[in-house]
Design a protein with these regions (language model features):
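Residues lining hydrophobic/aromatic ligand-binding pockets adjacent to catalytic sites
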Residues: 1-151
Length: 151
């Protein structure tokens, strides 16, 4: 059973750089947690991203309804909802068999709702690594005594 899950923000990087990072980390499934899966960058709009991932042999799953941000009452409150728990269970089920990367638009995970998703997955026994770029990852200090905050 694989117990590792990555996260990555699309940010302002291009699709080629995004896919290079995905491939460098041997990611098999991209789980899109954008509640509104659109972008100023055409290649990151849901339909185009889905097609591009499939072309590259990467599975694409959208879980924005369950795990997307921008929630009334705040995202922390949303983490207690049945929909959130359902989304987390779906991610966990996929991650038991494949290398998964949770994606959103925000580059920096500490400014994104991916940090709450990662925190929950951590309590379920998963190691969560937030990818910043090709050379840097981030794990909150209080979530890992074995890994530096930046690598």
């Amino acid at each position: 059973m694989l117990k590792l899950i990555y996260t990555l923000g699309t940010g302002t990087r291009g699709i080629d750089n995004f896919l290079k990072i995905i491939k460098n980390f041997h990611i098999e499934t991209v789980v899109d947690v954008r509640r509104f899966p659109t972008s100023k960058i055409e290649d990151f709009k849901k339909e185009r991203l889905l097609l591009r991932c499939l072309k590259e042999g990467i599975e694409y799953i959208h879980l924005g309804d369950e795990l997307g941000g921008y929630r009334k009452g705040g995202y922390e409150k949303w983490t207690k909802s049945d929909a959130f728990k359902s989304g987390i269970d779906k991610v966990a089920k996929i991650a038991n068999n494949k290398i998964v990367c949770i994606i959103c638009a925000e580059t920096l995970p500490w400014k994104c709702h991916r940090r709450f998703i990662g925190k929950k997955l951590l309590t379920m026994g998963y190691r969560v690594i937030h990818i910043i770029d090709e050379k840097h990852t981030w794990v909150p200090k209080n979530e890992s005594s074995k890994q530096m905050a930046f690598k």
